[in-house]
């Protein structure tokens, strides 16, 4: 029997506000344990939550970016459960009226076609703290993350393969990153993924029993975990077994999933409206204000780069991988840079430099202005393409004017025949054996003179002009 794979994803995105969702504590990552906490985070008796408006702003932006409807009257709910990293014994979340609902995004499939993936809801909530189990027999609780704002984005079960799930996550991460509401760094926990997967016989309308996957710390592991579950569940069903509704974690070392617990249903959390927070009215003016702050998104930029700038689909995809790179490219083109040349540099020397240095483009001194200037002085013959690599490294490390650096460092290409011809004559005088080989008709003897000339000029001879003048002077030797 063959089975159809059904996948839905729950993605938690940490919002990059300065303070937490309901307390004034810093929400920044990487501080000492419990440094970013106060009495609200500790859940002292009598303390009350205070809503961070910036979190609602971010939620509206996310909902708009994901083509969602927005609840004009929004409230929060209590999700009740006990765990050491949750000192209140409940989480403030949203249940029946999330900030966004009924959305969708398009994903690009391997065959080049697109597929629409529906998004059921996006709700705001507070994050829990972090438990660390020490080797000394104690468990430690760090509440820095407690109360950090999250938006949970829940897809419909529209994905039919691990590859589609990977494509959905890639597209979703791009969109969220472009809004500026999160850096979506999985390695820092600002983007976390839970996957729900079930199988059903082809032709059956009813979904099978789902399994939830956790501990998916990379898109690659999401795909691997789902691939393992497809095989595990299919094998179990074919042998007459029954799939339980359970939570499993992906074990990277063993390349498989391991049972964590039998899955609880929503009723186990006993949701009820949060009594300490009011109803929030989101009017059209607020929505329009947030919409005006949104950028053009990757799909629209890719189409523009292909249709208006003549770039390939591959180049357009690479240039829109991050908003900062895309903005850099667009600024360079707006300053008069040739789109293809700017693209080549960004994907070539710039990308190699960033990888080697472990930096992003905003962390180096290169600017759109000095990159465009460098490309211009390559085009007008001031420097060669080979010399430009040295110029680029200087600009990346120090910034400044490309032309000023070239002139100060003595890197200007020699293109004047009045300068080059005497040097060519000196090359002939210094290499009599090569001249003799050339005059005797020895095969490829003329090729050596190019190297001699470039060495004599320390690589500064204009290659095109040098080749033309060499040919002329060598012809005179024959005559």
Curated annotation (Swiss-Prot):
It holds the Pfam family GatB_Yqey. It catalyses: L-glutamyl-tRNA(Gln) + L-glutamine + ATP + H2O = L-glutaminyl-tRNA(Gln) + L-glutamate + ADP + phosphate + H(+); L-aspartyl-tRNA(Asn) + L-glutamine + ATP + H2O = L-asparaginyl-tRNA(Asn) + L-glutamate + ADP + phosphate + 2 H(+). InterPro entries: Asn/Gln-tRNA_amidoTrfase_suB/E, Asn/Gln-tRNA_Trfase_suB/E_cat, Asn/Gln_amidotransferase, Asn/Gln_tRNA_amidoTrase-B-like, GatB, GatB_C_1, GatB_Yqey_C_2, Gln-tRNA_amidoTrfase_suB_CS. Keywords: ATP-binding, Ligase, Nucleotide-binding, Protein biosynthesis. One of its GO terms (biological process) is translation. Gene3D superfamilies: 1.10.10.410, GatB domain, N-terminal subdomain (1.10.150.380). Its EC number is 6.3.5.-. SUPFAM superfamilies: GatB/YqeY motif, Glutamine synthetase/guanido kinase. It is an enzyme of class 6 (ligase). One of its GO terms (molecular function) is ATP binding. Allows the formation of correctly charged Asn-tRNA(Asn) or Gln-tRNA(Gln) through the transamidation of misacylated Asp-tRNA(Asn) or Glu-tRNA(Gln) in organisms which lack either or both of asparaginyl-tRNA or glutaminyl-tRNA synthetases. The reaction takes place in the presence of glutamine and ATP through an activated phospho-Asp-tRNA(Asn) or phospho-Glu-tRNA(Gln). Belongs to the GatB/GatE family. GatB subfamily. PANTHER family: GLUTAMYL-TRNA GLN AMIDOTRANSFERASE SUBUNIT B MITOCHONDRIAL AND PROKARYOTIC PET112-RELATED, GLUTAMYL-TRNA(GLN) AMIDOTRANSFERASE SUBUNIT B, MITOCHONDRIAL. Heterotrimer of A, B and C subunits. This is Aspartyl/glutamyl-tRNA(Asn/Gln) amidotransferase subunit B. It comes from Streptococcus pyogenes serotype M1. The gene is gatB.
């Amino acid at each position: 029997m063959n089975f159809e794979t059904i996948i839905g994803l729950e993605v938690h995105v940490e919002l990059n506000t300065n303070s937490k969702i309901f307390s004034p504590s810093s929400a920044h990552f990487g501080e000492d344990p419990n440094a970013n906490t106060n009495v609200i985070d500790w859940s002292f008796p009598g303390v009350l939550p205070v809503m961070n408006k910036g979190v609602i702003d971010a939620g509206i932006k996310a909902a708009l970016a994901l083509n969602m409807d927005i609840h004009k009257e929004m409230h929060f709910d209590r999700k009740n459960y006990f765990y050491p990293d949750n000192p209140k014994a409940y989480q403030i979340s949203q249940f029946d009226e999330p900030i966004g609902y009924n959305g969708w995004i398009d994903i690009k499939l391997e065959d080049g076609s697109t597929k629409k993936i529906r998004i059921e809801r996006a709700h705001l909530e507070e994050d829990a703290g972090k438990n660390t189990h020490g080797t000394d027999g104690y468990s430690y609780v760090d509440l820095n993350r407690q109360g950090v704002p999250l938006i949970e984005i829940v897809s419909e079960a529209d994905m039919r393969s691990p590859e589609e799930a990977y494509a959905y996550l890639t597209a979703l991460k791009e969109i969220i990153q472009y809004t500026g509401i999160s850096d979506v760094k999985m390695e820092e926990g600002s983007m976390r993924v839970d996957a729900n997967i079930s199988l059903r016989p082809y032709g059956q309308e009813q979904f099978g029993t789902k399994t939830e996957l956790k501990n998916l710390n990379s898109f690659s592991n999401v795909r691997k975990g789902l691939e393992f579950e497809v095989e595990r569940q299919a094998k179990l069903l074919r042998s007459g077994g029954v799939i339980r509704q359970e939570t499993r974690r992906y074990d990277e070392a063993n390349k498989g999933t391991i049972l964590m617990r039998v899955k609880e249903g929503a009723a186990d959390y006993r949701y009820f409206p949060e009594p300490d927070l009011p109803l929030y009215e989101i009017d059209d003016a607020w929505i329009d204000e947030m919409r005006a702050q949104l950028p053009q998104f990757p799909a629209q930029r890719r189409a523009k780069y292909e249709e208006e700038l003549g770039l390939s689909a591959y180049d357009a995809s690479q240039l829109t991988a991050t908003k900062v790179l895309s903005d850099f490219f667009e600024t360079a083109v707006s300053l008069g840079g040739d789109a293809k040349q700017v693209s080549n540099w960004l994907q070539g020397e710039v990308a190699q430099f960033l990888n080697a240095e472990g930096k992003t483009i905003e962390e180096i001194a290169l600017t759109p202005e000095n990159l465009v200037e460098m490309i211009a002085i390559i085009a007008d013959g001031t420097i060669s393409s080979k010399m430009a690599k040295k110029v680029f490294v200087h600009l990346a490390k120090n910034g400044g004017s490309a032309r000023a650096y070239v002139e100060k460092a003595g890197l200007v290409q020699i293109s004047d025949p009045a300068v080059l011809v005497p040097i060519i004559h000196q090359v002939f005088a210094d290499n009599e054996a090569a001249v003799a080989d050339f005059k005797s008709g020895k095969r490829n003897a003329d090729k050596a003179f190019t190297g001699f000339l470039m060495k004599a000029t320390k690589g500064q001879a204009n290659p095109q002009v040098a080749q033309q003048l060499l040919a002329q002077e060598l012809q005179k030797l024959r005559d």
